[in-house]
Amino acid sequence: MRGEFGIGSAAQYGSADLKKAVHVNENFRRANFTSADMRESDFSGSTFNGAYLEKAVAYKANFTGADFSDTLMDRMVLNDANLTNAVLVRSVLTRSDLAGAIIEGADFSDAVLDLPQKLALCKYASGTNPITGVNTRVSLGCGNKRRNAYGSPSSPLLSAPPQKMLDRDGFCDSETGLCDAK
């Protein structure tokens, strides 16, 4: 059994040529796919928890039902990839390209996406993830004025409502009621 403490693959696929490979329902937990060429491969039903896929190219790859929870997918190319019913909870997808990706039923809850990419996905996002029960549009924050107003987790200064304000002497502002301290 490979991997750290026998609980994952921890396999090294960095810069590997995986074009048109078939790895259905496999465990790639904590594996390294940095800069791997995964074009037109089939990874449907596979688990990638905690894996590294930064700069990987997965053009037209099939990730139907794959679990990408807590995965680093920074600068990944996912053009025309099939992410139907995939779980991308807490994944980091900054500077990744998902143009034309099929995301029906995908769960992006707490995932970090660039705002332009998120807005592009919201134009056609649909479905509900059968594993988590979360609606794809809800997980992306589509149409949520409050969430859009504060940005995304990738913008920490804008990702939460403003902190409670104190006046210049360190006391609560009684006019706005923004502080509970006495």
How would you describe each model-predicted region?
Residues 1-182:
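Tandem repeat scaffolds
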